[in-house]
Design a protein with these regions (language model features):
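A detector of tandem-repeat and repeat-rich interaction/domain scaffolds
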Residues: 1-2
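Catalytic machinery of carbohydrate-active enzymes
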Residues: 6-255
Length: 255
């Protein structure tokens, strides 16, 4: 039924996927009283660089969004973009990716004193976020007795396995193990986001052989810039998070 609201919503998303933004916006504007359509419209405006329109719409409807818990995650992300980290991390707790079904008998950590307790931290995000936010386990280590960090098998080799009071695990290696507390990596940030780290303060393993290899290939007298040009093809916000590698030809050919 073309008048069915889910059909109309899917039609708008289809137009966005096909980069037919004019027709998508027309549908979204017509149904912006529906919060689902409203969120997509605001997001689309931001992604198109129409920040003024996006911010006007967001600010006019923020009170409406606050009343609907289904969109707290979106509010959290927007607050984080705006630099309001306290509210941002508070609302981010309502994200859909938050793991709740692992080690069900283990208490969720919510800031209690754990200096003589063990705690396990679960990865829940993409590989990049797992690497980026893993440094906050260094803060957690300072206030706990033992920290275990569960990461995907495909990147376990990237982490230092000889850190004091931090164990790197996978879902397979924690079977039959018990912990006093658990927390997801995304939730850890609300406790430690103000902490500062030096560039070499992280959980990563330095592969000196690989470093030496690339130092020989690259001109060390010039700046070195890394470009992440593609996210997971099945990840959120695709195709907006990726660009064709060919489109970087001119940049990559610069001397």
């Amino acid at each position: 039924d073309s008048k069915y609201i889910e059909f109309i919503f899917n039609k708008a998303e289809y137009f966005i996927l096909k980069e037919n933004y004019i027709d998508a916006i027309e549908i979204l504007l017509e149904h912006k009283d529906n919060t689902k359509f409203l969120i997509i419209l605001i997001n689309l405006y931001f992604k198109m660089g129409r920040d003024h329109e996006a911010n006007l719409l967001l600010n006019d409807t923020r009170d409406k969004l606050i009343k609907d818990k289904n969109f707290y995650n979106y509010l959290g992300i927007r607050y984080l973009y705006e630099g309001n980290f306290e509210k941002g991390w508070e609302y981010y707790e309502f994200r859909g990716s938050k793991l709740t079904n692992i080690l069900k008998g283990t208490k969720l950590w919510n800031g209690e004193k754990i200096h003589n307790k063990s705690i396990v931290v679960f990865n829940e995000q993409g590989l990049g976020d797992t690497i980026q936010f893993s440094k906050y386990l260094l803060s957690l280590r300072k206030i706990s007795n033992e920290v275990s960090f569960v990461v995907p098998k495909k990147i376990i080799h990237l982490f230092n396995h000889n850190l004091d009071k931090i164990k790197i695990e996978t879902n397979d290696t924690i079977i039959n193990k018990t912990y006093d507390y658990k927390i997801t990596l995304g939730s850890l940030l609300k406790f430690f986001y103000k902490d500062k780290f030096k560039i070499n303060e992280n959980l990563l393993m330095r592969d000196q052989i690989n470093i030496n290899k690339w130092n020989k290939k690259l001109d060390i007298t010039k700046p070195k810039v890394g470009i992440v040009w593609s996210g997971s093809f099945l990840g959120p916000n695709e195709p907006f998070r990726s660009v064709p590698l060919k489109s970087l030809d001119k940049i990559l050919s610069l001397d």
